[in-house]
From Swiss-Prot:
Pfam families assigned: Intron_maturas2 (PF01348), MatK_N (PF01824)
GO MF annotation: an example: RNA binding
Keywords for this protein: Chloroplast, mRNA processing, Plastid, RNA-binding, tRNA processing
GO terms under biological process: mRNA processing; RNA splicing; tRNA processing
Family, per entry: Belongs to the intron maturase 2 family. MatK subfamily.
Cellular compartments per GO CC: chloroplast
InterPro entries: Domain_X, Maturase_MatK, Maturase_MatK_N
Major location category of this protein: plastid
UniProt protein name: Maturase K
Keyword hit for Transmembrane: no
Location of the protein in the cell: Plastid, Chloroplast
Function: Usually encoded in the trnK tRNA gene intron. Probably assists in splicing its own and other chloroplast group II introns.
Length: 370
């Protein structure tokens, strides 16, 4: 996707609301389940407590006792994505029908005939224009949709589509402020703890024609993933690793641990951060975070032994937390990669099975702002 997404200049940033009425779930289950007693039982269960009239997923998403409601939320999102995929397939097969006629699958043929007989407006070609590819990314309730089209009018039509989609199918008045049209070149978007944007790079090429030597500027687009250093420093300040300006602090709550446990905790944090943000080309922000953890670890040890940082450097060496097996492995991989390919490129670790804690906190703070 990194090599294809730069074909588009705009993208849709959609935030699905965490709050929804339980009756919506009952209507969704009614489409798939014909067991009426089960539907009555589900309605009774959801309406038993008054505070569940509007479900707040954020409050019980990680609690074991609320696994049933997590299942309902996942089923709710699954229904949304399944129907959206079905509409997209029909939309690209039948160009002679408005896209909102496919929103409700119940008696869709009768409704389409009824609409087409009464509607005398010509079908707009811009609305039914095909697009070569659609990139759909979702994490929880945050959606990023990009189209391989540089016309902003196409995205405005898709924004109207989503507003009608939520209104007709889920009976929800979706706020237009939750669907934002962003420009890749002007606005960088935050997703899963990364900052993404498209940058234009000018490459100078010399062309020699017999006795003439001409310089040609080639503009190359590159999809860049950036480490959000300032938001990460703010999160580290909340965890008491540093202050707001990024100056390392002593982790007082860890001074009761042994030296090996302190080393293991700091080393584990740095290892997870380096693994998660290894896909970024510019590693300057990572080394800044590594500097904060190194000095925070040294200050924690100095506070524990009631000594100075210089004493800690003499005892454990100035390369504190940088001599582990993980960092030697990353240096070896990056060295071999640069020898094979002289150009500056990024590589991803494929053994990441969960989102980093700091990245998850950044994503959560973004959703709370919206």
């Amino acid at each position: 996707m990194e090599h294809r997404i730069y074909n588009s200049n705009y993208f849709l940033d959609i935030t699905i609301p965490y709050f929804f009425h339980p009756e919506i779930l009952i209507r969704i289950f009614r489409r798939h389940i014909q067991d009426i007693p089960f539907l009555h039982f589900l309605r009774t269960l959801l309406y038993k407590n008054k505070c569940l009239n509007i479900l707040n997923i954020e409050n019980f998403f990680y609690l074991k006792k609320n696994q049933f409601f997590c299942f309902l939320w996942n089923f709710y999102i699954y229904e949304f994505e399944y129907l959206l995929n079905d509409i997209w397939e029909k939309f690209y097969k039948f160009e002679s029908v408005f896209f909102w006629n496919f929103i409700d699958k119940t008696n869709s043929i009768k409704k389409i005939k009824h609409i087409l007989k009464k509607s005398k407006k010509p079908i707009e070609k811009k609305i039914v224009k095909k697009i070569s590819s659609i990139h759909y990314i979702r994490y929880k309730n945050n959606l990023i949709i990009t189209l391989n089209d540089r016309n902003i009018l196409i995205l405005e039509n898709w924004k109207d589509f989503f507003l009608i989609f939520w209104q007709k199918y889920f009976n929800v008045w979706f706020k237009s402020s939750r669907i934002l049209i962003q420009n890749f070149y002007k606005n960088s978007f935050s997703f899963l703890g990364y900052m993404f944007r498209i940058e234009s790079q000018i490459i100078l090429i010399q062309i020699q024609i017999i006795n003439l030597l001409r310089n040609v500027n080639l503009i190359k687009k590159e999809f860049c993933s950036i480490i959000p250093v300032i938001p990460l420093i703010r999160l580290l300040a909340k965890e008491k690793f540093c202050d707001v300006l990024g100056r390392p602090l002593c982790k007082l709550s860890w001074t009761t641990l042994s030296d090996n446990e302190i080393f293991e905790r700091f080393d584990q944090i740095i290892k997870h951060i380096f693994s998660y943000y290894s896909g970024c080309i510019n590693k300057k922000g990572l080394y800044q975070l590594q500097y904060i953890f190194r000095f925070s670890c040294a200050k924690t040890l100095a506070c524990k032994h009631k000594s100075t940082i210089r004493t800690v450097w003499k005892k454990y060496g100035s390369n504190l937390l940088t001599s582990s097996i993980f960092f030697n492995k990353t240096k070896l991989i990056s060295l071999n990669f640069s020898n094979k390919n002289p150009y500056k490129k990024n590589f991803w670790y494929l053994n990441i099975i969960q989102v980093n804690y700091l990245a998850h906190s950044l994503q959560k703070s973004k959703l709370l702002k919206e």
